[in-house]
Amino acid sequence: MYQPLLLLPLLLTSAFANPHDPHIHHSLEKRASFPIPSSKGSVTFSSPKTISGTFDGGMKTYGRGVKCTGQDEGGDEDAVFILKDGATLKNAIIGADQIEGVHCEGSCTIENVWWTDVCEDALSLKGSGSGTHKIIGGGARNADDKVIQHNSGGKVIIQDFTVQNFGKLYRACGNCKKQFKRTVKISGVKASSGKALVGINSNYGDTASIKGCATSVKEICVEYEGTNNNSKEPKKKSSGPSSYCKYSEPLSKC
């Protein structure tokens, strides 16, 4: 008659022990890891560094020595790097001690660049041009809102990018005073723990094509009714695959 009572602690011990199984722990740890390269040193700029050609950061961590101000809008003076039209930034880590990350004033290439903690935005694509912006490799995490903010026109190519714990990976500006038709092509993305992967303004003819994997991302592609009134917020129209949001649902899990 005492056997069930004796077995109960053993069953409870077994049940609570399962989450600590080394194979399960390894699986969870692997899924949650952020594959940022090891830093080769740190550099703090007193003002933004302007790049007009190619800058190889040598996998050092770059910052401004300031505290993030959250979603308070900053300006060019708060950026770590400002890229002139046609410039390239590669092999760099953007630290947490900054506000505006990287600004591109025209077409630019961002290759193997990592953001340890995004502040207002990680990358802002500015200017009035209609060229091509390339983001190849690299990654970003801990973005309360946007990772890539696309204010200019043209095309954005995002290839083999890792993003974790974010609001949106890409957002076409919803209320810029000057609006454009914008295109984003995403391939090989690895996304986890996000609100939306992409936000576009379909009323301006924006399109997004998306391939990759996503885990715990609430929405993949959201269409908005954009406006050129900077004092108004764009209205959400729809979410999911369409002639503007081009992808197959569901994306595979990472």
UniProtKB/Swiss-Prot annotation:
Subcellular location: Secreted
Gene from which this protein is expressed: plyE
UniProt key word Cell cycle: no
Region called Disordered, residue ranges: 227-254
Signal sequence region: 1-17
Swiss-Prot/TrEMBL catalytic activity: Eliminative cleavage of (1->4)-alpha-D-galacturonan to give oligosaccharides with 4-deoxy-alpha-D-galact-4-enuronosyl groups at their non-reducing ends
Domain of life: Eukaryota
Protein name per Swiss-Prot or TrEMBL: Pectate lyase E
Glycan attachment sites: 229
Main enzyme class: lyase
pH sensitivity of activity: Optimum pH is 9.2.
Predominant place of localization: secreted
Gene Ontology MF terms in the entry: pectate lyase activity
